[in-house]
Amino acid sequence: MQVFPPPQVPLLGAHTSTSGGLQNAIYEGQEIGASTVQMFTANQRQWRRRPLTDDLINSFKTALEETSLSYIMSHAGYLINPGAPNPEILEKSRICIQQEIQDCLSLGITFVNFHPGAAVNDTKEACLDRIVSSFSLVEPLFEDSPPLVVLFETTAGQGTLVGSTFEELGYLIDKLKHKIPVGVCIDTCHIFASGYDITSPGSWKQVLKNFDDAIGLSYLRAFHLNDSMFPLGKHKDRHAPLGEGDIGMESFKFLMTDELTRMIPKYLETPGGPDLWTKEIRQLKSFQK
């Protein structure tokens, strides 16, 4: 079981488009001034995946070589619910998890990011245990495999979603860390929506302490950078451009400059597309000068 070490330089990017081929997400990253990107490796709203061909894999790896982008993150599909109480949904989710991981290994991707799951009409405790079981099934894929880290993304706490507290994510990490390479991706909008105040350096330091106590900072492997259209603790997952929401730009300046967070890869998911991301990347980089 191999794990990529943390990067030696700050990495910043956005969720770019795979329209016309997976490699185009990499080239779009270069165009917006990114050093990394997040992408979908398959249609995020369908159960079925198109099989990877050798040509597609080679085109993707060529794009990585030509651009020098690294620590690429794949965002798994939205239909996947590893903790589903419905047996049919659970089985489909487990098949998709295996296929997603296999494709990421073939492509040489560093991170594969999953929404933890939803309890639906069951308890969160039972949901968490099913998530552990779902990801335990892929342990054989990581024997003698290229490095790949499974990330669980923080959620906004809406509905029956699990993963809105560090304690819930800590439970998953603790149960899985000796089986597969695992970590956490903090979405700034999501944790703000779930009640974690990150509007100032002081509040961020407290949140990072809480994370360390519940999970361990070594498992914080990535950030999704998003401002929030709604106030603290409203459990609304609505992204806003950086500095134009209720979180504020001071929060993102902290992440770019603090010793604990500056080297952790960061991926923009703000609404606005490539033109906005180019500006946001330029502004975020300016904080480190």
Curated annotation (Swiss-Prot):
Amino acids binding Zn(2+) 3: H190, D237, H239
InterPro entries associated with the record: AP_endonuc_2 (IPR001719), AP_endonuc_F2_Zn_BS (IPR018246), Xyl_isomerase-like_sf (IPR036237), Xyl_isomerase-like_TIM-brl (IPR013022)
Keywords: DNA damage, DNA repair, Endonuclease, Hydrolase, Metal-binding, Nuclease, Zinc
Keyword match Protease: no
Cofactor note: Binds 3 Zn(2+) ions.
Signal peptide start-end: none
Annotated residues for binding of Zn(2+) 2: E153, D187, H224, E269
GO molecular function: deoxyribonuclease IV (phage-T4-induced) activity; DNA binding; DNA-(apurinic or apyrimidinic site) endonuclease activity; phosphoric diester hydrolase activity; zinc ion binding
PROSITE patterns for the chain: AP_NUCLEASE_F2_1, AP_NUCLEASE_F2_2, AP_NUCLEASE_F2_3, AP_NUCLEASE_F2_4
Any Pfam family matching the protein: AP_endonuc_2
Reaction catalysed by this enzyme: Endonucleolytic cleavage to 5'-phosphooligonucleotide end-products
Binding residues for Zn(2+) 1: H75, H115, E153
Cofactor: Zn(2+)
Biological processes per GO annotation: base-excision repair
Taxonomic superkingdom: Bacteria
Its EC number(s): 3.1.21.2
UniProt function note: Endonuclease IV plays a role in DNA repair. It cleaves phosphodiester bonds at apurinic or apyrimidinic (AP) sites, generating a 3'-hydroxyl group and a 5'-terminal sugar phosphate.
Family: Belongs to the AP endonuclease 2 family.
Name of the protein this chain belongs to: Probable endonuclease 4
Taxonomic lineage: Bacteria, Pseudomonadati, Chlamydiota, Chlamydiia, Chlamydiales
Gene this protein is translated from: nfo
